[in-house]
Amino acid sequence: MSDRPARVALYYATRDGQSRRIAEHLSRRLTEAGAPIPALDLAVAQPAASDLTAAAMVVLVAAVRYGRHLPEADRFLTVYRSLQSPPPLALASVNLTARKPGKATATGNVYLRKVIARHRLAPAVAVAFAGSLDYPRYGWRDRWIIRFIMLLTGGPTDPTTCIEYTSWRAVDDFAAAVGALVRRAGSP
């Protein structure tokens, strides 16, 4: 086993901040396990292909908005997919569908399945985390669109609703799975 921990590249795409919170939580857990791992915002800068190939593992936490992962996450995955020898990918989709039983897995979550298929990915680990619902924080248009989606899917529609659906235990489990993969990648 190497004394030097393998490098993990952790990126996120967020609109309302929940994916950032999840990525920062992952960063803290992975840092506690051995090496400082910053969570980098894809809206600020997209990594170069060389940044990705230098990593032992790449982690992406990507929010879904109106049925699609954010454009910066799609751009990131296009670069990742173009690599000749990409490092293992740990993928987390953040969406409100994952609040329902059976919808937090790569097979059970339609958005996660779609992004994996669209980019022809083979992630080492893939999960969906439920995000948060915060109607008062949304602008008028977003509030009405999201309320309509919630009406269709049986979710809360009261415009004063603020609910965090994220299971932090599930995020910790994902961090543990990523940490185990990184330790294996660092083995001779």
Region roles according to the model:
Residues 33-46:
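A short beta-strand-loop structural module common to alpha/beta enzyme folds
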